[in-house]
C-alpha cells in the first residue's frame, strides 16, 4: 500500500517519475490532503510547472480548496508571488472572480468581468474592493483600469486604509503585508506600489 506521505514527498521534491508511478497504482491520492491541501496546491506554490501538468493530466481538481483558507491552487501561487504560475493556471481554466483577478493582476479578465458582470466595481470581498487588492499586490495596470471604471480609492480596507495608504504601506514596509512573496518579487512589488501611489495622486489628488 502506498503511503500518502510518500506521494506528497515525491510531489514536493519534483520527482516526476515517482509521482507518475504512484498515481498509476493509486490515483485516489490526487484528492488526498497533506496539512489540508492537495498535491496540486504544493506544485503550484513551488512553481513546478511540469508537476502541475502531470497532476492535471492525471485528473487533479484545478479548483480544489484547501481546508484552512479555502484557497485554490492559483491562490496559493499568488500568495507566493508566482506570477507565471498564476497565469499558467488561469489559462488552463482556474476559476477567478473579479476580486481575485484584480489581486492576481489578470488585466484581461478584470476588463471582461467589469464589462460583463453586474457586480459593482466597488463591491467588497472580505472587506476589500478589487481596487484595494490590485494596489496591495502591485498591479498598476489593473489599478488604472478600475479607476477608469469607477473604482473608489477612498473606500477603506479592513484596517481603515484608503487605496493610497495601502500602496504607501507596501512601499514603506517593503511588502510586509504580503509576507510569503519571494524576495525578488517583493522588490518588484515595492516598485509597482510606488507607481500605484503616483497614479492615485495624479488621478485623484484627494486620495
What does each model-identified segment do?
Residues 2-35, 39, 105-125, 130:
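N-terminal segments that cap or nucleate solenoid repeat domains
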Residues 67-84, 153-207:
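Ankyrin repeat (ANK) tandem arrays and their immediately adjacent linkers/low-complexity segments
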Residues 9-15, 42-48, 76-82, 100-106, ...:
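Ankyrin repeat A-helix N-terminal signature
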